[in-house]
Design a protein with these regions (language model features):
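A short acidic, Gly/Pro-enriched loop at the edge of an enzyme's catalytic core
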Residues: 230-241
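Glycine-rich phosphate-binding loop and adjacent beta-alpha segment
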Residues: 248-308, 345
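Residue-level marker of beta-strand positions
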Residues: 13, 65-69, 83-84, 98, ...
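N-terminal Rossmann-like NAD(P) cofactor-binding module of classical short-chain dehydrogenase/reductase
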Residues: 86, 239-242, 265
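C-terminal hydrophobic helical "lid"/dimerization subdomain
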Residues: 1-9, 205, 252-253, 296-345
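Mid-domain Rossmann-like dinucleotide-binding core that forms the NAD(H)/NADP(H) cofactor-binding site
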Residues: 82, 140-224, 229
């Protein structure tokens, strides 16, 4: 596999200058230091968390759902040149209490958040610490490999978090049918089986139809409330709610659909939820928990799931654009009639 790559001294980097504008600027291609890899970025998935940088500007080339090829290794690295793979967002230290427990998403001494603090997947090249690189097989399409990150990783981790509190659920509701919500729905189906009831609520028809293709039962909130929908379909409630919206109205309304012993999982950052501790939590033994990204050690399991269910999972990807059309890609994504949108280069 090992081979030599011609690495230019400079390359065109997309720069988010604010006001929804992106310009390309020549920058020097960085050198990897000890323990670091230089990645030639080949695919990056758009995410709603990119939008603040699109609006306000960023000092780096962002993109945290990055898949690419190792083209150079720094001193002490062992990854072969030419290896394809994906980049785990969090530059975990590997030495703190959390990391020693395998809880790399809870590292207390992170060295980077790739795509937020350091150049990410929209850049032509990015430098990462070797420990955040996860290799994939040569036959894997790198655009599809990005699903190992926010789609599969975040989705599956949230389900595992729920199972820690409710190991025998009979139903699940996802709030929000954006890419993260679609990922949660897909991973729920793969975790619990095709006959397990997975409901998903949103107001955008395009995304709800996509969720139906994944096997979820869609709830169009423009037509009825959650309570009305469940009453019409003789559903008393659900055992798990996973909120990907971060919106108070979504959290409040969906929490009221939880059964006894139900688990409410907050995946989306954002707004608040107000609860009556006695009535909402204690009496019914419900739990409200958070779920942050996922752990690096979950990648191997998710990769096996990906290999076995590739055709099913890649339905989440609905649009692909070359890096030269990154502005058009964000315009399409902002319109919300998409699933996962991928930039390729």
């Amino acid at each position: 596999m090992s081979q030599a790559y011609a690495i230019p001294e400079t390359a065109d980097y997309p720069v988010f200058i604010g006001n929804n504008q992106i310009e390309f600027k020549q920058r020097k291609v960085p050198e990897p230091g000890p323990g670091q890899l230089l990645i030639q970025c080949k695919a990056n998935a758009l995410c709603a968390s990119d939008l603040p940088d699109l609006a306000n500007g960023a000092d780096i080339s962002i993109g945290h759902e990055n898949a690419g090829i190792v083209v150079k290794g720094g001193e002490g690295t062992t990854t072969e040149i030419g290896t394809k793979g994906v980049v785990f967002l969090m530059g975990y230290c590997g030495d703190c209490r959390s990391c020693n427990l395998g809880l790399t998403n809870q590292c207390v001494d992170k060295r980077a958040d790739y795509g937020f603090t350091h150049d990410g997947g929209y850049a032509p090249y990015s430098v990462i610490n070797e420990n955040v690189f996860f290799p994939v097989d040569d036959d894997v399409d790198l655009a599809e490999a990005t699903m190992l990150l926010d789609i599969m990783g975040t989705g599956h981790h949230s389900i595992k978090r729920a199972n820690q509190f409710h190991p025998d659920p009979q139903s699940l509701l996802v709030m929000g049918a954006g890419p993260i919500g679609l990922g949660i729905a897909a991973m729920a189906k793969l975790t619990y089986g095709k006959d397990f009831p997975v409901y998903i609520a949103d107001m955008i028809d395009y995304r709800l139809k996509l969720a139906e293709k994944l096997g979820a039962v869609s709830i169009q909130l423009n037509d009825h409330s959650l309570k009305e929908f469940f009453a019409q379909h003789n559903v008393d409630g659900v055992d798990i709610v996973i909120d990907s919206t971060g919106k108070t109205v979504a959290r409040q309304s969906s929490f009221q659909c939880l059964n006894q012993r139900g688990v409410f999982v907050c995946v989306g950052h954002g707004e608040q939820i107000t609860l009556d501790v006695s009535a909402d939590l204690v009496a019914n033994e419900r739990a409200v928990i958070g779920s942050e990204y996922f752990q690096y050690n979950e990648m191997a399991e998710n990769y096996e799931i990906f290999r076995k269910n590739r055709d099913y999972l890649k339905q989440v990807i609905t649009h692909r654009y070359p890096i030269s059309e990154i502005k058009e890609a964000f315009a399409k994504f902002n319109g919300r009639d998409t699933g996962k949108v991928i930039i390729e280069q």
